[in-house]
Amino acid sequence: MEFFTTSTRNLLKYAAAAGVKHYVALSVVGTERIPESPYLRAKAAQETLIKGGGIPYSIVHATQFFEFVKRIADEATVGTTVRVPAVLFQPMAADDVAKAVGRVAVGAPVNGTVEVAGPQQFRFDDLIRQGLAAYKDPREVVADPHARYFGAELDERSLVPWGEARLGDIRFDEWLGQPALQRR
């Protein structure tokens, strides 16, 4: 929490002093829906500071990145089993996130949130299973309705946009087909 609040206060202070006309921040889809998560509670506090910071702003809520699949699996592993929530998941490529943030940054401030997501929805366990198979990782993947994600139990749609979202172009299978070094 302290990292996000302190860094955001500092950035807002220096942005105001520099005359910044459009403050852009990257956050996470579902931030406001998962208050049990310490990480997402900190992101929500960051967003509150930005909204009250007096600078025109846009907050980009992105879904998780394909590049995080292995790390998510590692964090959810007990023994040789990966336990992930039994929910929908709509991750996107980091390249698409960067493009979306860039488009928002050169546009007019929305003084609100823009949601961006991958072009496909998956069951969380199916996506992790596909990702691990691409890495030739033999761990078993189990959909567990009580598995925690960022410290919280999730609802079916906690990690996907609820309303209209801008969708990335890169599909998960296309991303998996890239050279292994790009998937790190």
Residue ranges and their predicted role:
Residues 60-63, 85, 143-146:
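Conserved beta-strand termini and adjacent loop/short-helix elements that scaffold enzyme active sites
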Residues 27-33, 45-68, 117:
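Conserved beta-loop-beta element that borders a ligand/cofactor-binding pocket
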Residues 41-43, 75-78, 158-160:
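Short, hinge-like loop/turn segments at secondary-structure boundaries
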Residues 57-58, 71-92:
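A conserved pocket-lining segment of Rossmann-fold NAD(P)-dependent short-chain dehydrogenase/reductase
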Residues 1-23, 41-52:
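NAD(P)-cofactor binding segment of oxidoreductase domains
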Residues 95-184:
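Mid/C-terminal beta-alpha module of Rossmann-like enzyme folds, strongest
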Residues 1-5, 35-44, 87-95, 118-121:
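Short-chain dehydrogenase/reductase
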